[in-house]
């Protein structure tokens, strides 16, 4: 067993009563985001805690107190048995996972709940057979509220505010869009955005929602927030478990865990929509200005988006998937469940 996992597991088990150790099949979940991050507090940790309830105490999930692996190493670490369960940002899986990138495409998303339901249903209907994630059990797919543009020196209200400017962007679609717009892009996982934004070496940051900016402590550096009609992109994730550990659970316990995962997990993302509304209201009260991009700016962004969407359709075809059919289905589901 990996040394770091052995050390963490030993510490966790030491705190458990002996009777509990005997009764529980204890799994270790790694949260790549900090304990105070909304994703951890509202979504991942409550789900982990609920597993003990739905399995009547037969399965327990402990959440590591801090991440045991780099953001880009979550999938590999679960495969190696460093920990049993993890979740990873799709933008850090672009080489291996092409199909699930649908949720990060420009102009396809609605709300966190709508997009999460759409992604799960699209995966089940169109993508699962491709098995892009390999030897893990996919437990949930989820999408955060749409990402926006944060201006640090005034609003981003046109291409002239991007061209030649230094912009932090999440890897994947956000960074690709900003590069196409002529920005000098600094791409890194969201967990690193604070050090980049707080250092004031960029003029703007793009890709995640206002609620995440609050959680990542970057919102206070923004003067303006620009929303894009139809939404520029969204941050999407996959939650997975080591296949051998999953197979070792009883069928009854697997079904119990599935009952709070998948579609149920996606529906629960409404909490993130509610948080987004609250944080935006509080930010406006503190003086941050919110803007809706004008038609001319949106049209220019849509032009930049076309080759990104076309590239995804080509990737889908290479995986044996009718990309246009999947994309139409995703959009319809996102709109119907917003």
UniProtKB/Swiss-Prot annotation:
The keyword Transmembrane applies. It holds the Pfam family DctP. GO terms for molecular function: porin activity. GO terms for biological process: monoatomic ion transport. Keywords: Cell outer membrane, Ion transport, Membrane, Plasmid, Porin, Signal, Transmembrane, Transport. It is found in: Cell outer membrane. Residues 1-22 form the signal peptide. It comes from the Bacteria. CDD domains: PBP2_TRAP_DctP1_3_4_like (cd13601). GO terms for cellular component: cell outer membrane; pore complex. Induction: Induced by TSA. Transcriptionally regulated by TsaQ and TsaR. Disulfide bonds: none annotated. Involved in the uptake of p-toluenesulphonate (TSA). Forms a large, general diffusion pore with a preference for anions. Part of a two-component transport system composed of TsaT and TsaS. This is Outer membrane transporter protein TsaT. It comes from Comamonas testosteroni.
